[in-house]
């Protein structure tokens, strides 16, 4: 048990080293994905070492040049630099996979151990099941003359004790459960039983052998006796000595059997891996098959060589105590065949071989028990590692789930905010669309009204144009008439001027005649002459005033004609511009469905300005008509 305790301490130290390496791996700054970058390791290495050492370190940690290092490669590289890479196989497999490497094989071994119905063992030795010392299977293996291949039976019988290990390792409470309690941590209390049970049982078996030799014979197969699996082996030497005593009592040539040697192994050299577990399980399965074959091929109720030898020894002791040796030989000669000596020699050899095989099997069973104990400790350590890994994985899973929940909540909040913004934007666009539709409807109604007003204005403008045309014709006729009147007036004026000139000359002639006639009476004629002179002067002034007024009248008429021509030309030019703008308004009415809001507003303002100018133009025309010829605007029925 000291070796097992030492062995269990080594993986614990190894696990502590792995946990420290985990802390170093975390401190080196691993990424969130669980990998450590080679550049990071190289940078840290250059702070504490040289270039060649850093390159060697990187080569150990990243032999495949992947550019990143996981924890398994990190541990393997560190242990490879230390020269103990093999010690890390099981630990890394548990660290990385989180499962027991040999877990699938152990239940099979347990079930097989529970099915074996052969002889039972306690600490490497056989426990008697009946008053007889040897079980029926060993007695069948040691039969003097078996008819079915004695060499095969002799070869299988030593391995029979090894096969029975599956059924022997267990507590009394584990008879129905096989080896299940041995590999489970909750059954540790059942592994170790008091050593007094096995010691008392061994002492009782030895005592019954010595005191009741005359009653020792084979009675076949009996009930199995449960034995403690992990108790010490105090009766190994006793049973070995019993075998030796039996051999020496049959023949004096049989020497003392050597004592069983106990080997203490170093716990660090007993590391058992999964491959060895598989080998041991395969070996146990093979031994179980061979045991079943041996039972099937062995004859029933045959007297074994050991029983026969013990009968001879009992007869010899009994005859020597009574002093009747001759009667004993006489009875032996009568009861036995002539070849009894050869059979006794053959039995001596077989007993010696069986003793040696028993010692070998005892050593093998001790080693297997020790390895089994180591495997149990190993399983317990691996279970603890699995629990640690499960706890770590659960914590990591909870942390990851919490991060994902936080990220999901953040995304949900962002999504809700974005949806609210989009809904507000959609609502705003819907309001703008509704407003634009209302504006378009209003603009359409205004455009229709403007079209109607434009149509009315066009009709009025057409009527006014017709009237203006009539007025222009009338104006032309009036101008022609005015010219004719001017010509007639000029002719009349010239005629009047000539008439005035003739009258002046006639007046002068009459004045001269009058003067001549009045010369005889000068007193009276002086006053009349002065009156005539004044009348003549006044007439001349009036004539000059008439001429001046006529000239001013001519000038005013010319100016009036010029102004009327200018007004007419300006009115015609403005009318042309307004008609062109009206044509543009008609094209705008066709484009109102495809135009934008700003364009519609600008076109509407321009149309209103054109309408205002048209109103002013019509007002001017009406005022001009009222000034010149109001009769045109009269309504004629």
Swiss-Prot record:
Disulphide bonds in the chain? none
Result of mutating residue 627 to A? Abolishes Rab11-binding
PANTHER family, per the entry: RAB11 FAMILY-INTERACTING PROTEIN 4 (PTHR15726:SF5), RAB11-FAMILY INTERACTING PROTEIN (PTHR15726)
Can you tell which superkingdom this protein's organism belongs to? Eukaryota
User: Residue limits of the EF-hand domain?
Assistant: 49-84
Residue ranges of coiled coil: 280-617
Q: What is this protein called?
A: Rab11 family-interacting protein 4
UniProt region (Necessary for interaction with RAB11A, subcellular location, homo- or heterooligomerization), positions on chain: 82-637
Q: What is its main location?
A: other
Record's function text: Acts as a regulator of endocytic traffic by participating in membrane delivery. Required for the abscission step in cytokinesis, possibly by acting as an 'address tag' delivering recycling endosome membranes to the cleavage furrow during late cytokinesis. In case of infection by HCMV (human cytomegalovirus), may participate in egress of the virus out of nucleus; this function is independent of ARF6.
Q: Where in the cell is it found?
A: Endosome; Cytoplasm, Cytoskeleton, Spindle; Cytoplasm, Cytoskeleton, Microtubule organizing center, Centrosome; Recycling endosome membrane
- From what organism does this protein derive? Homo sapiens
